[in-house]
């Protein structure tokens, strides 16, 4: 297997020179450990995983002894299993002031962050690793996605061009490293195993009373609503659980890095806006598996093609920021009259409205809705329609046409 270089590597090197502690979060099997072990090659950094029950026991019951056994520089894998370590890592960092002393990984984002914020504030750099991005798979320099003509032109030169069929093959295959690298050639078998391990292991770590079959029905109901506003009542009905359970289980999915939310854009000058977030999966391959699409071809022609394409584009844009160690300020716009903008990208004091469509020939009617942002206190800048057009183009002077493969 060839190692796929991760865009986050340069950020890891940078923060290792500046902070005593690095924490890389992200769901299981996205390559956190693989990336860090690759960067460790030729160094004296040690490695220990808390998946090892004996090591976990020592870390929880005698964290001081654990750090004597595993002296820095060290990589501690799955650190969420022993939050007792954080206080002792803080003591070590304050005493020795050694940049890069501790590399930590963890798969339970919110649970981890609570302990980190309480114990390691100011001493830790936190980075998020997701499944592979388009840029990592096909090559090209990673920069945060912007609706800037110079940036878009540069992307057009670097990225690997793909037609509609190829885009839907990427969407259907998913972006987990084991599938993309060829370790697991059967994506259906991979996701079946992934879900079983995920539900029986990680979910039960957070809630041991969960019924596995009910949770599988639940996550399937959630996948069927990717790209939609969250409706816990509908999800609960389809999964045969109560609404409180549905909300709690959505929190578990977010905690484990399976889903994320796009919150509605709000501004004190904009009135009558909805307040409900939209829900997306980090990996569209998992969505396709859960919603039982048999091939990329059937998905491309199916009823969910628009929703899953939107999920793919939003997730890919989000990755371009996370892979540079930056927070993505992505929102969506929807008012009480159901007028909607798929993405509102806020950066550098401007707003870029973005629509996502399966068409290859978007028209001016798609960008009329962008004018709704003109009432906001933050100025509206260039807009874009991300679609299946083969190359970079424009609808007019203020709105570009951007192929999906250029993200």
What are these regions (language model features)?
Residues 54-56, 81-83, 111-112, 179, ...:
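Catalytic P-loop NTPase motifs of RecA-like helicase/translocase cores
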Residues 110-126, 138-143:
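Short regulatory helix/loop adjacent to the ATP-binding pocket of P-loop NTPases
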Residues 45-73:
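Short glycine-rich substrate-engagement loop in P-loop NTPases that contacts/grips substrate
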Residues 1-27, 33-46, 50, 70, ...:
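A cross-kingdom feature that marks ATP-driven nucleic-acid transaction machinery
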Residues 70-85:
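Conserved P-loop NTPase "ATPase switch" module shared by AAA+ and STAND
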Residues 105-109, 115, 130-132, 387-389:
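A short beta-strand-to-loop transition that corresponds to the Sensor-1 phosphate-sensing loop
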Residues 86-110, 117-119:
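Conserved catalytic/switch belt of AAA+ P-loop NTPases
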Residues 2, 135, 139-318, 322, ...:
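Interdomain hinge/linker elements that couple catalytic modules in large macromolecular machines
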């Amino acid at each position: 297997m060839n190692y796929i270089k991760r865009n986050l590597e340069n950020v890891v090197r940078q923060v290792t020179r500046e902070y005593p502690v690095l924490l890389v979060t992200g769901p299981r099997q996205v390559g956190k450990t693989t990336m860090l072990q690759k960067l460790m090659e030729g160094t004296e950094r040690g490695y220990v995983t808390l998946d090892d029950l004996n090591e976990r026991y020592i870390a929880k019951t005698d964290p001081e002894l654990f750090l004597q056994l595993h002296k820095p520089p060290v990589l501690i894998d799955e650190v969420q299993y022993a939050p007792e370590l954080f206080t002792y890592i803080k003591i070590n960092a304050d005493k020795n002031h050694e940049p890069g002393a501790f590399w930590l990984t963890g798969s339970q984002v919110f649970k981890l962050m609570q302990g980190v914020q309480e114990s390691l504030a100011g001493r830790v750099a936190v980075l998020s690793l997701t499944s592979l991005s388009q840029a990592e798979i096909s090559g090209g320099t990673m920069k945060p996605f912007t609706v800037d003509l110079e940036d878009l032109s540069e992307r057009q030169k670097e990225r690997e061009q793909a037609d509609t069929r190829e885009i839907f093959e990427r969407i259907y295959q998913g972006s987990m490293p084991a599938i993309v690298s060829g370790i697991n050639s059967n994506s259906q078998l991979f996701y079946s195993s992934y879900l079983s391990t995920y539900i029986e292991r990680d979910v039960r770590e957070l809630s041991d009373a969960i019924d596995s079959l009910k949770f599988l029905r639940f996550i399937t109901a959630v996948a069927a609503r990717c790209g939609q506003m969250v409706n816990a009542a509908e999800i609960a009905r389809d999964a045969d659980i109560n609404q409180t359970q549905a909300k709690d289980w959505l929190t578990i999915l977010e905690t484990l890095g399976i889903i994320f939310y796009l919150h509605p854009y709000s501004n004190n000058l904009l009135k009558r806006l909805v307040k409900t977030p939209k829900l997306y999966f980090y990996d569209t391959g998992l969505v396709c598996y859960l919603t039982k699409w048999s091939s990329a071809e059937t998905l491309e022609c199916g009823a969910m093609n628009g929703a899953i394409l939107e999920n793919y584009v939003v997730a890919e844009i989000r990755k371009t920021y996370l892979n540079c160690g930056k927070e993505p300020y992505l929102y969506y716009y929807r008012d009480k009259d159901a007028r909607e903008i798929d993405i509102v990208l806020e950066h550098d004091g401007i707003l870029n409205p973005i629509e996502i469509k399966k068409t290859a020939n978007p028209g001016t009617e798609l960008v009329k809705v962008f004018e709704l942002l003109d009432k906001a206190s933050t100025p509206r800048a260039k807009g874009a329609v991300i679609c299946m057009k083969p190359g970079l183009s424009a609808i007019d002077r203020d709105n570009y046409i951007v192929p999906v493969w250029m993200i």
